[in-house]
Amino acid sequence: TSRPLKHKFAVRYPHSFDHGYEYGLVTADNRLLLGGWRNHSPTGEVGTYSIDVNPHIEEGLKQFARDHYDIVEEIDWEFSWSGIMAASKTGLPFIGPTTSPRVYACCAYTGHGFSWGHGSAKLLADIIAGSDVPAVARFFNPKAGF
């Protein structure tokens, strides 16, 4: 994620490139937030459990920003992080109570946390609050297992 930029972005909402393998958004304070690039890693990061930032991916995303955004100012990258990809058998995220008391899950986005995150958090909050939830929520049950 960059420091706030002066650049006037034409697209501020979440967007993706390369069939969703690279994605970005512009924050309210005009920072460029990018993610993805794992498909350019020799292993695709399959089987890795490290949360250390992969320099190949980080540099790839910085080059991606230079190649795909018409930003003339120097981009100062303030934040960088990594995460472990998780997937369920169905490819759908887990949202709801687990088999442990008072433990809930909101995970296993199969790399699509950008698109699933906000709605999943809302659904989990409704589940915890005991509010009515849509019938489709049963498909996200963590008790179904990985």
Where are the model-predicted features located?
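Conserved phosphate-coordination/catalytic loops
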Residues: 15, 55, 86
